Structure formats: C-alpha cells, structure tokens
Amino acid sequence: MPKIVILPHQDLCPDGAVLEANSGETILDAALRNGIEIEHACEKSCACTTCHCIVREGFDSLPESSEQEDDMLDKAWGLEPESRLSCQARVTDEDLVVEIPRYTINHAREH
C-alpha cells in the first residue's frame, strides 16, 4: 500500500501525518478518510481550487492532469510546477509527500 506523507499544516494537520492510501484513490479521499479535512468546495468535481496541493515527492508517478484540472490550477493561489488538485490526483503504487498550502482562494478572499 502506498503511503502519503502530509507535511505539517498549521490548521489541518499541525504535526503532519503518514497515511496509507489505496492505489487509484485520490489524494483528497485518502486524506479525508484519515481525518484530514482538506477543503473541497466543489464536492470533488474539478470546479474550484480549494483542494490544491503541492506534491513535493512522487509527482512524476501520478497520472497526467487533465486539461480541465490544468485550467483550474491556473487559478490556484500559490501555484507551483508540482501543484495538483487533490480531488483529481490519483495515487499509484509509489509513496508521495504532499504539502497543503496555507491558503486557498477561499481563504485569500476571507482575509
């Protein structure tokens, strides 16, 4: 079973976490199943960027992003080359290290 290391996040996971994921499962579903409440305002339909994450290790093992995901990522706060929407990125058999950005578009508008 592949593992996902979630780097520490002040609000969602202050100490970080190591999760077991199922091959084919999205990063978001694995996180939610393990009690890490990543925001997903569009209910996992690839219509927002609130579940934006940065895959620090294992990025190349993920299936390619769709054009729709790429279009949404263009709107993400803090976009990096290793950015993915966690509701779309499906785990393979390789371990991942994932960073959840401090802010999302929703948070940026609230503050």
Swiss-Prot record:
CDD domains: fer2. Keywords: 2Fe-2S, Electron transport, Iron, Iron-sulfur, Metal-binding, Transport. The keyword Methyltransferase does not apply. Binds 1 [2Fe-2S] cluster. [2Fe-2S] cluster binds at residues 42, 48, 51, 87. Belongs to the adrenodoxin/putidaredoxin family. This is 2Fe-2S ferredoxin. It comes from Escherichia coli (strain K12). The gene is fdx.
